[in-house]
Amino acid sequence: MLKESPFFSVITILGTALAICMIMVMVIVFEIQNKGFKPELNRDRTLYVKDVAITHKNEEDGGMNYSLVGGRVAKECFFTLKTPEAVSMQLMRMQTLVTSTDQTRRMKCDQIRTDEGFWKIFDFEFLAGKPFLRSDVESNIKKAVISRRLALRIFGLADESVIGQTIFVARRPYVVGGIVEDVSPLANRAYAQIWIPYAQSDVDRLINEETLEGLIGSYRVLILARSSGDFNKIKTEVEQNVARFNNSLQELKIDLMKQPDTQMESRLRLWSNVVPDVPRM
């Protein structure tokens, strides 16, 4: 066939090769988005809550608000769960400026504010030091875990000698408590160059302010199951907690819109009010 019609034969071969390449790319993208790799090794047993819907108990009052998870919701609906291995909440990633104490070395980097549960859910490679603890979160201790790249940029080293040194994060002093290997941006939920504790006092303050009964917030919740076989049990426990929580509210109620989600469901949940049509695996 190649001799009889070389032009069409070449087109056919190239078309077949292109189709195979496209399929391979799609498979690779799927693997990156859904399969576990360090530090997100536990994707297959992690559940996620991105946001909540807030409505009036009296439907005649109308209106619906969508928000990231509030501290009160996280505290009463998720941190009280008995089945999971770990629960964590984190503020959305943001950019910040990190500088040395003499201000001569600096780096603009991505920052995540989170808690001690974060380090149980994700499998970071620590080069030196250790993650911050629950006591650091509760006491508002200014301690940071930084990436290898950030350590090299600020100190020129990424070893034990950096632990206990001071850096400035958005002009506030933090003590370096740990150094981890650099994280790929493809690990979307774990990726940053600096991780610091959120202040429990800030969470409590926002709960007590006029934020729709403390329901509005800026957090996302991660739940690590002991195995994927516990997913249904965890979801049932969450539903029970939400029902109990709604009964305690005066005028409002929350709806998790079928959350918590699996890794794939969370990726496909593009809009707050649209539940992804993905069968449970």
Annotate each PLM feature.
Residues 2-5, 12, 33, 49-51, ...:
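Generic structural signal for small/hydrophobic residues in well-ordered secondary structure
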Residues 5-35:
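Short, strongly hydrophobic transmembrane alpha-helices
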Residues 11, 46, 112, 116:
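Membrane-embedded glycan transfer/ligation machinery
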Residues 26-99, 105, 216-220:
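Membrane-proximal extracellular/periplasmic loop immediately following the first transmembrane helix
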Residues 68, 108, 112-113, 144-145:
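Short aromatic/basic micro-patch
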Residues 91, 101-133, 137-138:
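The feature marks short, hydrophobic/small-residue-biased sequence motifs that occur predominantly
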Residues 115-132, 142-278:
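Mid-to-C-terminal secondary-structure elements
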